[in-house]
Structures are given as C-alpha cells and as structure tokens.
UniProtKB/Swiss-Prot annotation:
Keywords: Membrane, Transmembrane, Transmembrane helix. It comes from the Eukaryota. Residues 311-322, 334-346 have a biased composition (Basic and acidic residues). Residues 493-503 have a biased composition (Basic residues). This is Uncharacterized protein SPEM2. Pfam families: Spem1. Its main location: membrane. Coiled coil: none annotated. Residues 155-176, 311-381, 436-456, 472-503 are annotated as: Disordered. The chain crosses the membrane at residues 26-46. It is found in: Membrane. GO terms for cellular component: membrane. InterPro entries: SPEM1_N.
C-alpha cells in the first residue's frame, strides 16, 4: 500500500511540473506570431509602394505616348494659349542722345516756304561746315547787300522758319559731303585730330563768303534775345510726343560741344564764335585757299591766336595770275613790322569805321592783331579792302536787350597779346583802346562739360539743359543792366569762359 501511495504522489508532481512548461511554450508561440505579423506587414507595405511607383510610371509613360500620337496625327491649327508670351518693348527718348540734323527734303509748310525763298539766291550761295555737335550751314551773299542782310538777320522768327535751313540738292552737296551725314559715325566719337571735316572734304573755294546758317528760333539770330543756346527747345519738348510727330526728319541734340581743336584756341574765342566758327584742327595744305580776312563773318577771327595768320585767298589768286609763287601758308609774327603797319593804317581804319563803331567790336579789321606780321604790299591790300568790311557786315544790334552764352561782345580781334611779348599796341582809335583787354594768362584749352557724361561708350561730353537755361537767364539779366550803346565800349567783352564759369 505504501508503494502505491508513493507512486501516486510522484505522478501528481510530474503533472504539476508539466503544466508551467506548456504555459511558457504558449507565450513563446504568441510572441513569435506577433513578430511574424509585423514583418509581414512591413514587407507588404514595401511591396505595395514599389508596385505603386511602377504603376505611376507606367501610367505617365502611357499618357505621354498618347499625347505624341495625337500631335503627330492631328496637329493643332492654333498655338496653345498657355505657350504664348507677350513681348513688351519700352523705348525711352533720351534728350541727350537726340541730334538736330538738317532735313533732306522740305516736308513741312514752313520748310516749303523757306525753299521758295532760297531758290532765287541759290546761285550765290556757298556752304561751309562748322565743327561740333551743331553742324550748320548758311548761304552766303555778295558784298553790297548790307540792307538785305540786315533785314534777313533781324527778321523775327514768327513766320514759321524751320529749325535749320534745307541743304541744296545736286552737285554742291556731293562735293562738300562725299558720304551721307547719317551714314557717318557720330562726330563727337571721332578723335579730335580727325573730327574736323575741313581736312577731309573738298571745298568750293575760299573766295566766296561762308557764313553760319540762320537759326529759326523766336529769339533772334545774333543773340539779341538769347542766341543759339536760348533757341534750343525746352527739355520737356524732347519727352513729349510732339517731337515724334514732326513731319521732317529730326534728331534733336540738347548738347553743345564748343571745343577748340588746337592749342592756340582760347575758350573765350570759342564761346564768342558759336554762330560762325570755322574750326581747324591742323594747318591745311599750302595749296588749299584759306579764308579771306576781308570776308570774315561776324564774330569770327580767321587769325589763330598762336601768332600765325593764313594768307588771303584772293591775294593768293592774284599773285598766282601775276606769275608769282603763292606765299607760304603762315607768316611768323614780327613786332616791328606790326608796329609800322598799325601806325600806317590807323588813319585809314579810323575813317572807314567811324560810322560802324557800334557794330564792329569783335570783327574789326586785322589791325587789332598786334602779333601778325605784314609786308607793305599786304598792308596796302588790307587798306584797299577796308570798304569791303563796311559793306559785308551790317550794323549789329546792341546787347541792351539780352545776351546769351554766345558772347556777342567777345572782342576776339581785340585780344591783346600777353605781357611777356613786350609789344605796345598804339591807340589807333578810341574804340580799340576801350575794347582791348589784356589777358596775360592763357585760358585752358581742355573741354570741361557743365554737367555730365552721357554714359556708355560715348567719348563726348554734354551740357545740361538746366544749366544752359540758368546761364541764359543770367546773361539776360546781365545784359539788361548794361548802359545804352553810345559807343563801342558799351558792348563789354564777355570773357566768361576765362573765369571758369562756362568751362
């Protein structure tokens, strides 16, 4: 019995030990199942993403293929609106880059009116170039037309003149301009040694009178109410649409380059010869005929201030006909000959110019150039041609009304030589003694702009329109305060550029 009981107890213990092992096995199975489920879920998601990407690529490729097939089979008649792009071009009219040029044809009524007036005098005209951004021409008239010239110069500009004269057509312009003006490069961009058209283009001959063109503005030609600079339109005109609607070809340029192209030119002479300046950058060949001193236009001195003087073209021609060799192109200064010449001719000039003292302050005969040497034959020639000066140049109006930057009272002929030369100028007349002003320090010849550079690759300087307007108003106020022109001394010599105001 005891053995049987012992076996029963052993069986119970074995059963108790087997039950916890079964529970542990069940737990391990559950954990294994959970891990397997997670792994399967991750694998399933990864496979689904890959499958989805593959499906998307396949759909995109199929769509592209269908679009290409549709385009090749039936091309669209009109472009897609989504592919159309609007192109906007904005053009800005810069007042600095605009140029004033002569119209090739009379396209307006005012130009037509001027063409009719210029046809009857075309046989008497000669044209000449003026260096600078303001290239202007004016027809010349023969001597003996004093009253007619006065009427032309003093005529008010309310009759509808065009801004510039029409250039004559035909062989004259073909000789003076071998290539069209607008086909050339900008003259300001040329170097100073090659910017003067005198050395490049042939002339019709210096025997004829070359005068500046009449500017058609409401301020007068000779600066009685402002001159060339005041005749420029206001800066607002360049920005207005009226400028674009002009019937004739217009390139307005609001700059004035008034620069001398030689070391012997002074700024005062440049400013005093805005209307008529025959620029010369280098001495011309000796065979070329130079301007006649007895035909020099108003405000222009054919004698450079460096002590050399070109010979008279008419005198050259006369000597050539007599069988003499033409004289050299330049004559060195000789103070002793000048002294004798001035003493010899003082009486003749006092008699010839007594009635024109109010109109001849800056274009007196060559006697005022004290550093110029003359022979006895040349002195007789100049004295014989003194009446030519009286007939050619009309009486100019006094500066009591207004002046401009074109210093009309500039005594370019009466500039005294430097004090170092030691030359005593005899007082041939009261007019010379009053007008002459000594300038011991030569003015600078470099061109200094008033305001700014236009920028870009341009090498030229420009004047600001506001600065020009201010200086014109200042000159008008200055001229209104001048005394009445009782004598020639009432017209002062406006050496404004020498003081650095205009430079």
């Amino acid at each position: 019995m005891e053995n049987q009981l012992w076996q029963n107890t052993l069986r119970c213990c074995e059963q108790y030990q087997e039950s916890p092992q079964d529970a542990e096995n069940i737990l391990f199975l559950l954990l294994g199942l959970i891990i397997l489920v997670n792994i399967s879920i991750n694998v399933a998601t990864a496979m689904w993403q890959g499958l989805q990407n593959a499906i998307d690529k396949m759909i995109f490729w199929m769509n592209q293929k269908t679009e290409v097939v549709q385009v090749t089979e039936c091309p669209p008649k009109e472009p897609q609106p989504a592919n159309v792009q609007d192109v906007h071009i904005h053009c800005i009219l810069d007042p600095v880059q605009v140029k004033m040029a002569q119209p090739t044809q009379c396209s307006s009524s005012s130009s037509h009116y001027f063409c009719k007036r210029s046809n009857d005098r075309r046989s008497r005209r000669r044209y000449g170039y003026q260096q600078g951004n303001l290239q202007i021409h004016q027809s010349s008239q023969q001597q003996g037309c004093l009253s007619h010239q006065q009427r032309l110069r003093n005529r008010p500009l309310s009759r509808g003149y065009p801004p510039f004269r029409k250039q004559p057509q035909g062989h004259k312009m073909s000789q003076m301009r071998p290539m069209p003006f607008f086909d050339m490069e900008d003259r300001d961009s040329l170097p100073e040694g090659h910017s003067c058209p005198h050395a490049k283009q042939p002339r019709r001959g210096w025997g004829s009178l070359c005068k500046p063109v009449r500017l058609a503005s409401n301020v007068g030609l000779w600066g009685r109410q402002g001159g060339i600079l005041a005749s420029l339109p206001l800066p607002s005109l360049y920005l207005s649409p009226e400028l674009r609607r002009l019937p004739k070809r217009v390139e307005a340029k609001s700059e004035l380059r008034l620069q001398g192209f030689g070391p012997h030119y002074s700024q005062s002479r440049i400013w005093g010869t805005v209307e008529a300046e025959q620029w010369a950058s280098s001495p011309p060949p000796p065979r070329r005929l130079l301007p006649n001193p007895s035909w020099v236009t108003v405000g222009y001195s054919s004698f450079p201030s460096g002590g050399h003087i070109p010979y008279d073209a008419r005198d050259q021609w006369r000597r050539g006909t007599e069988g003499c060799e033409p004289p050299p192109a330049f004559v060195p200064r000789n103070p002793r000959e000048v002294q004798g010449y001035r003493d010899h001719n003082s009486q003749a000039h006092r008699q010839n110019f007594s009635s024109h003292t109010h109109s001849q302050p800056n274009h007196s005969p060559p006697q005022s150039m004290g550093h110029v040497g003359y022979s006895s034959r040349e002195s007789h020639e100049v004295r014989r041609r003194a009446p030519d000066w009286i007939e050619v140049f009309p009486s100019r109006h006094p500066l009591t009304t207004s002046t401009s930057l074109t210093a009309l009272g500039e005594a370019s002929y009466q500039r005294a030589p430097p004090a170092s030369s030691g030359l005593m100028i005899p007082h041939s007349s009261q007019r010379l003694a009053e007008v002459q002003i000594s300038d011991p320090t030569p003015p600078p010849t470099t061109f200094v702009p008033l305001s700014r550079n236009p920028g870009g690759n341009a090498t030229y300087q420009v004047y600001d329109s506001l600065e020009l307007k201010r200086q014109v108003q200042e000159n008008r106020g200055r001229a209104s305060s001048l005394p009445p022109p009782s004598t020639s001394a009432s017209r002062p010599s406006l050496h404004r550029s020498r003081t650095g105001k205009l430079n």
